Amino acid sequence: MIMERGSANLVYVDESGFEPSVGRLHGWSLRGQKVHGEQAGNRRPRQSLIAARRGKDFLAPLLFFGTTNTAWVHRWMAQMLFKELRPNSTLIFDNAAFHNKSDLEAIAHQHGHHILFLPPYSPDLNPIEHDFANLKRQRQFAPPETALAEIIKCYGNYTE
């Protein structure tokens, strides 16, 4: 399928969750003394990001509070992703439980696109995983008052 359509129309799709606060991994102290720090013990609502990657383009990032489910993925595809795709694109998804294969294939075919699913437990085959790792790293070193949406906007072409 990839040989027929070419790699320029391959679009990798994934989602990632972001905790509200990020603890520091390192600190400074006098030699031989422990570093003490505080970290919130209560849980706050996490944010989720759904996005796609085509080549070097970061497509249709959607940031929202809560966790990703089937309804979020379908809504995101219909309202954001399809507007940014080239005709006859191939969407590549992982095997998350909420990626209902038959539903996704039907929605994609209605818009003239195709779906492929990665083998289970193969994040190394999905290049957008590197984007999520980079975003989390940038967030970790950003000033605490920096909104996650601002980090994503700087990283790609994020629009609310």
Whereabouts are the PLM-identified features?
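Short functional hotspots at interaction and active-site rims
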Residues: 1-160
